[in-house]
UniProtKB/Swiss-Prot annotation:
Main localization (coarse): membrane
UniProt subcellular location: Membrane
Family: Belongs to the WSCD family.
The protein's name: WSCD family member GA21586
Transmembrane segments: 8-28
Species name: Drosophila pseudoobscura pseudoobscura (Fruit fly)
The entry's keywords: Glycoprotein, Membrane, Transmembrane, Transmembrane helix
Entry-listed glycosylation sites: N78, N150, N226, N232
This protein's GO CC annotations: membrane
Membrane topology classification: Single-pass membrane protein
Length: 316
């Protein structure tokens, strides 16, 4: 009997100790029952680190305009009035384009500096430029007249060619760039946006076949785009070469404004020249390899010589 009593006592004590331990642990895990340990953050100064050389990804790009932008006939509403959901893309772009004796196209192959020229003209005139497209990136960073295709804007951006493409326009500025550079610029845009870059790995996808096909397709498009507008557009046309715009910016802007029959404001023009780099001209980046093979470069240069000759451009 005494042995059984001790066994009963031992089992009871074990159960009591177990229950007590469970209760103790439960009380310690109740939220707020004990102070929270401070979180030690390594390199805690980094979240507040900002440098103009290394902008944070979420940092909003801002443009200093020489003058508040407006439409040709009315002041521009506040930028905050523009919301992406206010815009609807027409099912037929040509239906939104109305032929006008005042409508001027800014035609170019993608990667030829169209956005940069629009930026320069907005700086030099204070007038908005439009587009047949609705690029939300541009819409939010200095081009609120994206998808405006009427004479309320200075000119209208297009990368299209063919009868329907030029029918609404009375005049056109054709911006032409060296195809070798334009194709790389377009490759960068498709991979990294208007001011970004394609990673080196992108050129080597599928053992380089993707890049080779890209060059072949875009070279044909470059030739068709430029010759189609230069030969078949029946309105007044002015050909502007990107290299001239880079090296003789003021001279070219004056000539463009004269073609547009828009009076030159000397103060605005000086301001535009001072701020000509802006944020829409992609900075140069040297690759550690040449993306063009000898055969590709020979093909590109051959087509360039033909097109430039037909456009009246003499290459030295």
């Amino acid at each position: 009997m005494a042995l059984q009593g001790w066994r009963f006592f031992g089992v009871s004590a074990t159960i009591i100790i177990y229950i007590g331990g469970v209760l103790f642990l439960s009380m310690n895990n109740i939220p707020g029952s004990h102070p929270k340990r401070p979180r030690i953050e390594r390199f805690a100064e980094f979240p507040s680190f900002h440098s103009p050389r290394f902008p944070m990804p979420s940092r909003k790009m801002t443009i200093r305009w020489c003058r508040d932008l407006k439409y040709m006939n009315r002041d521009l509403p506040n930028y905050t009035d523009y919301r992406a959901d206010f815009y609807t893309l027409p099912s037929d772009v040509s239906a939104s384009l109305q032929a006008s004796p005042m409508l001027t196209a800014l035609a170019s192959f993608p990667g030829s500096g169209n956005t940069w020229l629009r930026y320069l003209l907005q700086q030099a005139t204070g007038i908005l430029t439009g587009s047949i497209y609705k690029d939300y990136g541009l819409l939010k960073t200095g081009f609120p007249a994206e998808n405006v295709c009427n004479s309320s804007v200075l000119l209208v951006k297009t990368h299209e060619w063919g009868g329907k493409s030029w029918a609404p326009f009375a005049k056109a500025i054709l911006l032409v760039r060296d195809p070798e550079k334009a194709i790389i610029a377009e490759f960068n845009r498709q991979s990294g946006g208007h001011i970004g870059f394609a990673s080196p790995d992108r050129y080597k996808r599928t053992k380089g076949k993707y890049w080779q096909q890209f060059v072949s397709n875009k070279l044909k498009g470059w030739e068709l785009m430029n010759l189609s507008w230069a030969r078949n557009f029946t309105g007044s046309i002015k050909v502007v070469f990107y290299d001239d715009l880079v090296h003789h910016t003021e001279r070219e802007l004056r000539a463009i404004l004269e073609f547009l029959q828009f009076p030159v404001d000397e103060t605005l023009l000086r301001c535009a020249i001072l701020r000509k780099e802006g944020i829409f001209r992609r900075k140069k980046r040297l690759l550690s390899f040449d993306p063009y093979t000898e055969a590709m470069r020979a093909q590109v240069q051959a087509r360039k010589r033909i097109v430039y000759s037909l456009l009246g451009r003499k290459e030295h």
